[in-house]
From Swiss-Prot:
GO terms for cellular component: virion component. It is found in: Virion. Residues 98-254 form the Helicase ATP-binding domain. It is an enzyme of class 3 (hydrolase). SUPFAM superfamilies: P-loop containing nucleoside triphosphate hydrolases (SSF52540). PROSITE patterns: HELICASE_ATP_BIND_1, HELICASE_CTER. Keywords: ATP-binding, DNA-binding, Helicase, Hydrolase, Late protein, Nucleotide-binding, Transcription, Virion. This is Transcript termination protein A18. Residues 302-468 form the Helicase C-terminal domain. InterPro entries: Helicase/UvrB_N (IPR006935), Helicase_ATP-bd (IPR014001), Helicase_C-like (IPR001650), P-loop_NTPase (IPR027417). Interacts with G2. Might be part of a transcription complex composed at least of G2, A18, and H5. The keyword Protein biosynthesis does not apply. Belongs to the helicase family. Poxviruses subfamily.
Length: 478
């Protein structure tokens, strides 16, 4: 259980530094999730993960006693490359120090996309030799964990049919590893069971959760805190450090050649009745999250045609072979899918549709294919999609925050046989009402990809055409 006490000025200041001015929410002594105000006389549950960092004064010693040992006999360590071994060495040293100083054994593994967080975490799982729960945000991530866990030869159970079905299964069967989706944590009985019977908890893609929200995960970490806990992410949320405050971060030295191709094209103005109607909402509250910006971009036929022509040409010339095309809206996704199917047929073109339950099977099939175009949304494929062989990313949408951009670019930053990785951007639009918005968001992608992720911007691609100016100059020279 987390520590329940009054939040004095020092502790309040420590907690607030993770929130960038946002309000602080915690569970009070009555287990209600409320805002914490300065000088409050109420008692609040303070997540024990906060004290995993030695810079935070330890209010009460945490005596970690792990009794749930793994039962498998012939356990093996997965193979790691040197930098992964370096991370393991840092983590194990830190965990021993936490144990000896009576601090909670909590750590965030802040490692770049493509580093191999999954296999590194499985190695640590074998080091601890304690029963483990692996929690993922969605079913799509389960397969990559299954593959990694099998390398250890630990027994495991995968739960995809709901927590009730899993609880029935656990009455007659046990396993060293449970792989679950985070929805399972809404069941209090299940939370108590894994707290009592499993010692290690691995939270994959921890940035997907805002732990300042009153969620099942927030409750679990507060009232059923694991004895050993790892958060895995390439783009950590600062506020989540309140629940897991110690971070290991190792920069990856990569042999990949990462290219950023910006395809510029100056279009003649284009509009339709549909576009004009939607443009009326651009400067209203309805466009707070730029939904109309993306809807209008979906209708930009000249830009869409340029994207299809560019990708088709590169794919035919085999300068790109395993391509993911990312959009924001489903209508945009089906447009590109239909166009690419006309060009190359269904043997090469696949749809990453979140509404289709067979999409995970499609993703698995792509692991063995030499050439394909995979069209999907940023919601489905922006985080956790595990197709290491991808060599190209085509970004068709505009509105992405910094975390989404880094996660999206990470889809093509994984080590594979192909060391040449290419990202395509299309910063121009034929629709004048969204010209500046598209340019602004494209600049953000360029900045993160070059300054933070090591992409090199290549010479500007495409054809620049300004028909009105061309006609004017032509008439002057006659």
């Amino acid at each position: 259980m987390s520590v329940c006490l009054e939040v004095d000025y020092t502790l309040y200041t420590e907690l607030k530094k993770f929130l960038n001015g946002q309000p602080l929410f915690l569970f009070n002594a009555d287990k209600n999730y409320v805002e914490v105000v300065p000088s409050s006389t109420l008692k609040f549950y303070i997540p024990i993960g906060l004290f995993s960092n030695s810079n935070v004064a330890l209010i009460r010693p945490v005596h970690t006693t792990c009794t749930n040992h793994i039962e498998s006999v012939d356990v093996t360590f997965p193979n790691l490359y040197p930098l992964q071994k370096h991370v393991v060495a840092e983590v194990t040293t830190s965990m021993r120090q936490k144990l000896s100083t009576h601090r909670p054994m909590y750590m965030t593994l802040h490692l770049s996309c493509g580093f191999g967080k999954t296999v590194t975490a499985c190695y640590l799982m074998v080091v601890h030799r304690r029963k483990t729960v692996i929690c993922v945000p969605n079913k799509m991530l389960i397969h990559q964990w299954k593959v990694a866990v099998e390398l250890t030869k630990l027994s495991y159970i995968i739960s995809t049919d709901g927590v009730s079905m899993l609880l029935k299964q656990l009455r007659t069967k046990t396993a060293d590893v449970l792989i679950i989706v985070s929805r399972h944590l809404s069941n209090d009985y299940f939370c108590k069971k894994i707290h009592d019977e499993y010692d290690t908890f691995i939270l994959d893609e921890s940035h997907m959760y805002n732990l300042m929200n009153n969620s099942a995960l927030t409750k679990f970490l507060t009232f059923y805190p694991p004895r050993i806990c790892y958060f895995l992410t390439a783009t950590p949320r600062l506020m989540n450090r309140i629940y897991c405050n110690d971070v290991v971060n190792v920069l990856k030295v990569s042999a990949l050649t990462k290219r950023l191709k910006i395809v510029e094209y100056f279009f003649e103005p284009y509009s339709t009745d549909c576009i004009r109607q939607m443009a009326k909402h651009l400067n209203t509250e309805n466009n707070k999250y730029h939904i109309y910006t993306e809807k209008i971009l979906t209708e930009d036929l000249p830009r869409n045609n340029l994207i299809v022509e560019t990708v088709s040409r590169e794919f035919r010339n085999e300068t790109i072979e395993r391509v993911i095309v990312i959009v924001k809206l489903r209508k945009h996704m089906t447009f590109f899918y239909d166009r690419f199917v006309k060009e190359f047929g269904t043997d090469y073109v696949y749809l990453g549709d979140a509404k289709n339950k067979d999409t995970s099977t499609v993703v698995k099939s792509l692991l063995q294919k030499k050439k394909f175009i995979f069209v999907s949304t940023s919601h489905y494929s922006g985080t956790g999609l595990d197709i290491p062989s991808l060599d190209s990313l085509v970004i068709c949408c505009a509105v992405l925050n910094s975390m989404q951009i880094e996660q999206l670019l990470g889809r093509v930053c994984r080590e594979s046989e192909s060391v040449k990785k290419t990202v395509f951007l299309f910063p121009n639009t034929s629709i004048r009402e969204i010209k500046h918005s598209l340019g602004f968001f494209t600049e953000r992608i360029v900045s993160i990809s070059t300054d933070k992720l090591g992409f090199e911007q290549e010479g500007i691609e495409g054809t620049k055409e300004e028909p009105v100016l061309t006609k004017a100059f032509s008439s002057q020279t006659r």
